[in-house]
């Protein structure tokens, strides 16, 4: 980071001429061109730490270099960090058997997906329904059933109800898989709640939870598939959830079906990945060592088995392309700013905000030097703009709202307290945050359908322009860092 200060001293030459004239303008054409590449089959969903993620990172670093941003780390735009990594390798299989006889093979992507941190395995065994997959003294889905050498079918999430004085364990898949393994299971299948108004379809996800890797197959199946496994039992899946929820007691039993699951994985406990960071230097003698951070996560949830990939156009190729486009606005128009701007593309948001957490703790300077952090995540699908964290940084929120009121006028009033996603690690350090997102942005979240053609070009251009104008005002010194009004951990 010392080199940044040196670069700032060398490059930040104060000009007497007015450099406020804008020649390069934000364009949805340029934004969507970048999104199209980042969400392409070539980049296979940009799984953090993967070869394809590094292709995306190198592409963005090259763009940073071409517009003249200063590298964050000596001569590199990369900030290295180590993350847990898991890749689903070719070729996978998931099939239904009855009485040990093959019935049907399911389609990856349509009928099921592997959890991002699924273990490997080649198994064919009876399936046992185990409710919520919880095993604690006060409530035990495993107490009256033998799952040794079998495959567990469990609801993906924990109950919406509580028992007095009882705190549920984590509902993340690693914890449920760990519990299943401890009881002797050799695999686990997750299904969404059948009684939800819109039960969640299988989605790509690398969010796994704490603890060691659980090396058994872990898959998320859709409701029709789950019902085919339940078929022949006393209850339907809907009836099972209703009965368990109403009586608040476990109801587990062996099913009259078997599952064959084959999956190979490449698991690495510590794999190197990178944040991509470029600096636009400020010129004011007093303020140039202060930073405005504009960030978005570059990673998504990857692909599986060489058969499918999750494009991640809105999540978050849109935010990444917007960071690049705003950087171009500053650099190509040679805008003169008092503060410096740090343009950041984070790795591994999807597995737990790891890139953002790493940068927040390894800035190379006091975090009090960060005037504000602006985060862009899922900003191109929907119909309006929402600015998060307004309850924690009301002055910053009002500033952005006032800018929008004289421009696109797309912002709604709703906001929240706290950071959210990659903004959270910075919020926890007391840094004012603004979270740019769009209303109704999650229609295709982590789905195979999150493609560039689902995006709203006009909205996308508008929110990117708002992020640019807000960043510019902060960089010009028209906002002073405020004390966080409402802290959320």
Predicted regions and their residues:
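C-terminal motif of bacterial Sec signal peptides marking the signal peptidase cleavage site
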Residues: 13-15
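N-terminal capping segment at the start of a domain
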Residues: 18, 25-51, 67, 72-73, ...
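Extracellular/luminal Protease-associated
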Residues: 20, 107-217, 281, 310, ...
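Catalytic-core environment of secreted peptidases
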Residues: 25-43, 48-71, 146, 150-171, ...
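Noncatalytic luminal/extracellular "stalk/propeptide" segments of secretory-pathway proteins
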Residues: 41-159
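Soluble metallo-hydrolase cores and metallopeptidase-like ectodomains found primarily
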Residues: 99, 111-144, 213-312, 328-332
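Metal-dependent peptidase/peptidase-like ectodomains
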Residues: 105, 216-238, 346-444
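His/Asp/Glu-rich mid-to-C-terminal helical/loop segments that flank catalytic regions of hydrolases
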Residues: 328, 332, 443-489
């Amino acid at each position: 980071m010392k080199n940044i200060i040196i670069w700032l001293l060398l490059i930040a030459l104060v000009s007497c001429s007015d450099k406020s004239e804008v020649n390069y303008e934000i364009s949805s054409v340029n934004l969507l061109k970048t999104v199209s590449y980042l969400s392409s089959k070539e980049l296979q969903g940009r799984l953090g730490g993967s070869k394809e993620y590094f292709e995306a990172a190198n592409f963005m670093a090259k763009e940073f270099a071409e517009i003249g941003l200063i590298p964050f780390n000596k001569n590199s735009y990369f900030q290295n960090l180590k993350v847990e990594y898991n890749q689903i390798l070719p070729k996978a299989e998931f099939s239904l058997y009855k009485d040990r006889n093959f019935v049907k093979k399911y389609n990856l992507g349509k009928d099921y997906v592997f959890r991002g941190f699924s273990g490997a395995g080649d198994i064919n065994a009876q399936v046992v329904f185990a409710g919520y997959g919880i095993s604690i003294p006060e409530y035990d889905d495993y107490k009256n059933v033998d799952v040794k050498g079998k495959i567990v079918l469990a609801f993906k999430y924990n109950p919406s109800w509580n028992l007095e004085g009882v705190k549920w364990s984590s509902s993340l898949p690693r914890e449920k898989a760990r519990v299943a393994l401890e009881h002797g299971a050799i695999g686990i299948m997750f299904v969404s709640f059948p009684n939800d108004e819109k039960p969640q379809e299988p989605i790509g996800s690398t969010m796994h939870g704490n603890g060691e890797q659980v090396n058994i197959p872990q898959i998320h199946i859709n409701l029709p598939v789950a019902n085919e496994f339940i078929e022949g039992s006393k209850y339907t899946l809907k009836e099972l959830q209703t009965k368990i929820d109403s009586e608040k007691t476990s109801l587990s039993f062996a099913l009259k079906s078997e599952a064959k699951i084959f999956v190979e994985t490449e698991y690495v406990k510590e794999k190197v990945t990178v944040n991509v960071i470029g600096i636009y230097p400020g010129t004011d003698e007093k303020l140039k060592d202060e930073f405005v951070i504009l960030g978005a996560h570059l990673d998504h949830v990857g692909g599986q088995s060489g058969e499918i990939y999750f494009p991640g156009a809105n999540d978050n190729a849109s935010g990444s392309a917007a960071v690049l486009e705003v950087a171009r606005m500053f650099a190509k128009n040679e805008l003169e700013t008092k503060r410096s701007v740090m343009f950041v593309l984070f790795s591994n948001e999807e597995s737990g905000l790891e890139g953002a957490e790493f940068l927040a703790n390894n800035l190379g300077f006091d975090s009090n030097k960060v005037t504000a952090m602006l985060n862009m995540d899922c900003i191109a699908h929907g119909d309006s703009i929402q600015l998060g964290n307004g309850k924690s940084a009301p002055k910053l929120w009002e500033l952005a709202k006032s800018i929008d009121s004289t421009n696109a006028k797309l912002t709604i009033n709703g906001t929240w307290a706290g950071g959210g996603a990659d903004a959270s690690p910075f919020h926890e350090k007391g840094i004012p945050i603004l979270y740019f997102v769009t209303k109704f942005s999650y229609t295709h979240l982590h789905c195979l359908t999150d493609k560039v053609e689902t995006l709203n070009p006009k909205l996308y251009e508008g929110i990117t322009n708002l992020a640019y104008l807000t960043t510019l005002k902060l960089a010009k010194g028209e906002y002073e860092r405020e004390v966080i009004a409402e802290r959320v951990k």
